[in-house]
Amino acid sequence: KVIKALICAAKNGNKVTVVIELLARFDEASNINWSKRMQDAGIHVIFGVEGLKIHSKLVHIGTRHGDIACVSTGNFHEGNARMYTDYTIMTAHRPIVREVNAVFDFIEKPYTPVNFKELLVSPNDMRKRLIALINKEIKNKEQGKEAYILAKVNHITDQALIEKLYEASATGVQIELVVRGNCSLVTGIPGISENIHINGIIDRYLEHSRIFIFANDGDEKYYIGSADWMPRNLDNRIEVLAPVYDKEIQADLKRIVCYGYRDTAKGRIVDGTGENRLWKGFRSTLCKGSTPAFVEADKTNVLFRSQEELYKEYKNTL
């Protein structure tokens, strides 16, 4: 549907540029076919950057009334949309929109020096800025200020980030993570990672979103985007994390992470044992029972299934 809409836009006289990554697992043939159809419709199709796989999910729309940008955690793929949990932010915030456009410029003219202030972009500066965000939490904790990290990712295997999280934990920063897949971080090591706790969810839908929350001494910083904490995402791919400033959306993102962290029905303990034991009972210093679903689960001591609870809540608001 997205591709057909782009083709329709081009046929209606709009200038359309599409960046498509041909090296997508299991979708190479489909991507080649759709690329030809878009080119036949007059769309300018770009096939990525040599040496850098494009993994970011971005849209930039120019209108007479102002430009709009979208940054997503998931692909524009109808099959994935039925099976994956993902989130997209659509914004007219001018600094973010300008920088999303700059990412497209970078893709068209690769290795051109580009500076980003709003977006965290790989391979430009994402690693450096993530480490800076963690360092800020360490510094705040040392100064007696509020400091914690909440995050939801697919994988954590980057050694430099893992070492930095260990340093934060050793300083006393509380770190609560939802990690669905590969995790090289070992929790519960005395003096090193005893302040890090990880829940992993395997349920009906594939957990695919990436959400990052930093306490920042009470003025929380929120980011969503395409990047996991892996060397390939930080060094060898074009990835984008975007800040989220809207308080209502921030609250929703925090609820998503906390629901995942508090899942006692499909959540498993991610630690060094590899036993994948299920969580039993509530355990969190950051995700306390502030929603009706949490309160009811605590009161009745029933299993809390995050995907089911989120589905019901979203369904009731539509």
Task: State where each predicted segment sits.
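PLD/PLD-like phosphodiesterase catalytic module centered on the HKD motif
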Residues: 2, 8, 12-83, 90-97, ...
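Short charge-dense sequence patches
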Residues: 80-88, 111-116
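Short, compositionally biased "basic patch" segments
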Residues: 95-114, 129
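Gly-rich Lys/Arg/Thr-decorated short loops/hinges at beta-loop-alpha junctions or inter-strand turns
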Residues: 110-119, 144-146
